From Swiss-Prot:
Main localization, broad class: nucleus
Species for this entry: Saimiri boliviensis boliviensis (Bolivian squirrel monkey)
Gene this protein is translated from: PAX9
GO terms for MF: DNA-binding transcription factor activity, RNA polymerase II-specific; RNA polymerase II cis-regulatory region sequence-specific DNA binding
Protein name per Swiss-Prot or TrEMBL: Paired box protein Pax-9
Protein's job: Transcription factor required for normal development of thymus, parathyroid glands, ultimobranchial bodies, teeth, skeletal elements of skull and larynx as well as distal limbs.
UniProt DNA-binding region: 4-130
Length: 341
């Protein structure tokens, strides 16, 4: 039965391009050739091209077969599971091996012979399609095995959680009412505790130390200086605030900046604006000072023209300060007036 589709050759015969000639026509060509008919006459009689007749007769004379296909059958399959297994083993042992080296090893190990050994292109295709993904998966598994176990996640800003003066002070001092509490991990940035840092070598104070001094809260480093505060000095007498101590402090304030011991005259009030003071009484140089020792401040040797050793600023000594010399002078004056009368 002839196919329903095809092309017509130059002899008027019908053929299908790319398809072999039917077996019946092949057998008829061989029978006519055995009868002694020339190939050209067979071609005209059967309407088959001269090339097709010559090719079929030549194959029949060589192999004795009229069937189409490769002579001696197709090449057997060479990419067997055993060959693929050996190729995978070679690749795992030496990841940088070439395809032609794998081919030589297959021949050297006796896995294949020269008739069924795969070609270099076939080995490359096997490495790319079948072993490539497995090799990548093996590398990934080995990486996961050698990778250390993940550590538990730490909260933010606790990577370098080292003790610092700020956190220690915050732990000791309670938060005052009305002020929101600040977590210790967010209050101040962490500093790397190293004894070989530049600030430690040069003796420069770190930022946390400066902030701890300026902060209103009490820090451990400030506790060392608390013993030297003014609160531990004995309190001065109340009368000394308005008396001699006040004048001595004013003298220290006015004359403390004077160069070479000279007074700063421009900082004084003019003499015309000051009221005249009464003449001080004569006081014996031997008297007892009853003020608190903490209120005494040494003044400069320079004194005002109208002042006395007891009042450098020409001020009266308050009556609350009792001096034995003044009492003796007053008693002597009263006795003189009484005798005169």
């Amino acid at each position: 039965m002839e196919p329903a589709f095809g092309e017509v050759n130059q002899l008027g015969g019908v053929f299908v391009n790319g398809r072999p000639l039917p077996n019946a026509i092949r057998l008829r060509i061989v029978e006519l050739a055995q009868l002694g008919i020339r190939p050209c006459d067979i071609s005209r009689q059967l309407r088959v091209s001269h090339g097709c007749v010559s090719k079929i007769l030549a194959r029949y004379n060589e192999t004795g077969s009229i069937l189409p296909g490769a002579i001696g059958g197709s090449k057997p399959r060479v990419t067997t599971p055993t060959v693929v297994k050996h190729i995978r083993t070679y690749k795992q042992r030496d990841p940088g091996i070439f395809a032609w080296e794998i081919r030589d090893r297959l021949l050297a190990d006796g896995v294949c012979d020269k008739y069924n050994v795969p070609s270099v292109s076939s080995i490359s295709r096997i490495l790319r399609n079948k072993i490539g993904n497995l090799a990548q998966q093996g590398h990934y598994d080995s990486y996961k095995q050698h990778q250390p176990a993940p550590q538990p996640a730490l909260p933010y800003n606790h990577i370098y959680s080292y003790p610092s003066p700020i956190t220690a002070a915050a732990a000791k001092v309670p938060t005052p009412p009305g002020v929101p509490a600040i977590p210790g991990s967010v209050a101040m940035p962490r500093t790397w505790p190293s004894s070989h840092s530049v600030t430690d070598i040069l003796g420069i104070r770190s930022i946390t130390d400066q902030v701890s001094d300026s902060s209103p809260y009490h820090s451990p480093k400030v506790e060392e200086w608390s013993s030297l505060g003014r609160s531990n000095f004995p309190a001065a007498a109340p009368h000394a605030v308005n008396g001699l101590e006040k004048g001595a402090l004013e003298q220290e304030t006015k004359y403390g900046q004077a160069p070479n011991g000279l007074p700063a005259v421009g900082s004084f009030v003019s003499a015309s604006s000051m009221a005249p003071y009464p003449t001080p009484a004569q006081v014996s140089p031997y008297m007892t000072y009853s003020a608190a020792p903490s209120g005494y401040v040494a003044g400069h040797g320079w004194q005002h023209a109208g002042s006395t050793p007891l009042s450098p600023h020409n001020c009266d000594i308050p009556a609350s300060l009792a001096f034995k010399g003044m009492q003796a002078a007053r008693e002597g004056s009263h006795s003189v007036t009484a005798s005169a009368l």
